[in-house]
Each structure stands twice: as C-alpha cells, then as structure tokens.
C-alpha cells in the first residue's frame, strides 16, 4: 500500500508540474534592430497557451502595452511602465497586438500569436484604428499580420 501511494503521489506531482509551467520567451524593446528603427524583436512571436513573454526594456524610453480592440475578447490587458521590463502570461488563444506607447506614431508595435490565430480577421479590421496614427512605417503592422495567413 505504501509503495502504491508513493507511486501515485510521484505521478501526480509529475503531471502537475507539466501542466503548470509554460515556456518563457523574451521580446526586446529596441531603438534599432533588424526590422528598422523603433522595433520589438522578435516582431512577431508565436507561443502556446500558458506561455509567458518577458518584454525586456533593452534600451531606454520604451514600454510594452496591449492595445484595446487588438487582442482576443476576454484576454487580460497589460500596461508596462516606461523603462521597465514587464512579464505577461498568455492564457487566451488568438492574436495580440501591442505597442510602445511613446513611439506608437513611429509604428513601434509587435504581435504575439497564442496558439491559433482565431481572431485574425477581427484584428485586421480593428487595426485600421491604429495604423491611421502612424507617421512612418505605415505598413509595418499590415506586413506583420500578413505573415499569419
């Protein structure tokens, strides 16, 4: 009986540890990178439900914040502080578009796809509200979203 309980507890804790922990990813906030000026790297990140993303303030003057209307319904919004790392756990499947608030007009935006891009069409339609504010890199968000088709 003792042997059975020991094995049962071992299996329970093994199963619990697998379910509890998702992968961790890092996105850097940069003045200049592979995608040009004022970018997040990687610009488009695909993760699984339950994964965590650390938005790293690699260079000063940036933040990471979700954009209302450009994330799955019922998903938790986030607002990182200026010059601060912020860590976000993604529990809802779909496409999330986020910004660097002070550099939105420069199209400093990024995309996280959690699982399947179930809300892609809605994001494309709603993205017009944000792309009209860009003064440079006007096609950046459209090009990011085009990679998800």
List PLM regions with ranges:
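Bacterial N-terminal signal peptides
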Residues: 8-17
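Extracytoplasmic copper-binding redox domains, predominantly the cupredoxin/blue-copper superfamily
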Residues: 20-149
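Bacterial N-terminal signal peptides that target proteins for export
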Residues: 1-9
């Amino acid at each position: 009986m003792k042997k059975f309980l020991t094995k049962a507890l071992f299996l329970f804790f093994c199963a619990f540890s697998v379910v509890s922990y998702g992968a961790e990813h890092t996105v850097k906030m940069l003045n200049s990178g592979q995608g040009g000026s004022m970018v997040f790297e990687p610009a488009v990140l695909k993760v699984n439900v339950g994964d965590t993303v650390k938005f790293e303030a690699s260079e000063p003057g940036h933040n990471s914040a979700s954009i209302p209307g450009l994330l799955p319904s019922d998903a938790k919004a986030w607002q990182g502080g200026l010059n601060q790392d912020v860590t976000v756990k993604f529990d809802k499947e779909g496409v999330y578009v986020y910004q660097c608030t002070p550099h939105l007009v420069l199209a400093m935006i990024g995309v996280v796809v959690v699982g399947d891009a179930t809300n892609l069409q809605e994001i494309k339609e709603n993205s017009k509200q944000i792309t009209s504010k860009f003064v440079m890199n006007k096609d950046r968000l459209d090009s990011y979203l085009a990679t998800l088709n």
